[in-house]
């Protein structure tokens, strides 16, 4: 599937392989 960086997530599994689910402000986003 196509990788969407900085998409909302609940856990690392929701992100691409190279991304981690990190809290940014009040939301969690897939980030490096």
Curated annotation (Swiss-Prot):
The keyword Zinc-finger does not apply. Expressed by the venom gland. It comes from the Eukaryota. One of its GO terms (molecular function) is toxin activity. Keywords: Disulfide bond, Ion channel impairing toxin, Knottin, Neurotoxin, Secreted, Toxin, Voltage-gated sodium channel impairing toxin. It is found in: Secreted. InterPro entries: Huwentoxin-1. Disulfide bonds join 3-16, 9-21, 15-30. The keyword Disulfide bond applies. Pfam families: Toxin_12. One of its GO terms (cellular component) is extracellular region. The presence of a 'disulfide through disulfide knot' structurally defines this protein as a knottin. Blocks voltage-gated sodium channels (Nav). Causes tail erection, scratching and a reduction in mobility at a dose level of 1.40 mg/mouse. Belongs to the neurotoxin 10 (Hwtx-1) family. 60 (Tx2-9) subfamily. This is U5-ctenitoxin-Pn1a. It comes from Phoneutria nigriventer. The lineage of its organism: Eukaryota, Metazoa, Ecdysozoa, Arthropoda, Chelicerata.
């Amino acid at each position: 599937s196509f990788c969407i960086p900085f998409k909302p997530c609940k856990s690392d599994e929701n992100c691409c392989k190279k991304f981690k689910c990190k809290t940014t402000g009040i939301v969690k986003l897939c980030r490096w």
